[in-house]
Amino acid sequence: MPDTPPGCFARVAIDVPIAHVGASLFDYAIAPELAQAARVGSWVVVPWGRGRRVGLVAERADRSEIDTARIRPLAAVLEDAPVLPPSWFELVRFCADYYHRGFGEVALPAIPKLLRTPPAPKARGSAFARARQRFVAAAAAEAGSTPPPLNDAQRAALDVLLAARGFGVHLLHGITGSGKTEVYLHWLSEVLAREATGQVLLLVPEIALTPQLATQVAARFPAHSVAVLHSDLADVDRAAHWLAAVEGRARVVIGTRLAALAPLAALAAIVVDEEHDASYKQQEGARYSARDLAIVAASQRRVPIALGSATPSLESW
């Protein structure tokens, strides 16, 4: 290819297995007409072999160590896709380094499949537009329900959480049925009231726990949209809820371990329920502990995190 002007290389994360973790980003040339759109955090379509893949611009560079004659140009920038925040790239980079995986092997599988599929040449409308239209927040059975009063032990735990500012890990230890969920909900209610655009993340270990909790949360917070993230959702529904979370339209996000890698730009608090549960450990593909990643995310974002359990793990205790 012809000489490329300085600053016109994109280092792109792609979901492909790699032999060497240090070589986890791939260099592509940026054509002048894409120079403004192809910024860090943007979504791009790139040539890969004889096909095309969706990738994420993780870095911009003035030069490349690859022979420029071998560097292929970006095929397109998906301009209706949300630009992902630097905080998310920081978390993904930690995960990739700590668990010895390629950056793209962590970043791309965390995104719903529908959104990381290259658009068909003659597609009518984008996957992002369809997903935005699809989002319907979790419905409440009894919208605006009155929270039950807390007992003394619950109130004491809540007071500790309410006093938390900045990063801190708080273990809520109580037997099953002791009312830990009520403490979470009272706390998150205060966080949402205090943070005008803040978002809260509530992780649960099993998919089966999400419907009832989502209904309960929606009833408690009728003014806020609730997004639900887990692997059993249909592709279009997962994409719709993920986009609502990423774009801040959903201020409450409930999910299983995959939600730990959701790029929430306005994260204000995290809850990990049943933090001891082995289901938080991803065993396929890029392996990680969602509980541990949630703690890292809270540290990086300087927000409080509550871990709840009747039988806490040794690490948390």
Segments the model singles out, each with a brief description of its role:
Residues 1-317:
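Accessory, non-ATPase domains that flank or precede helicase/AAA+ motor cores in DNA-metabolism machines
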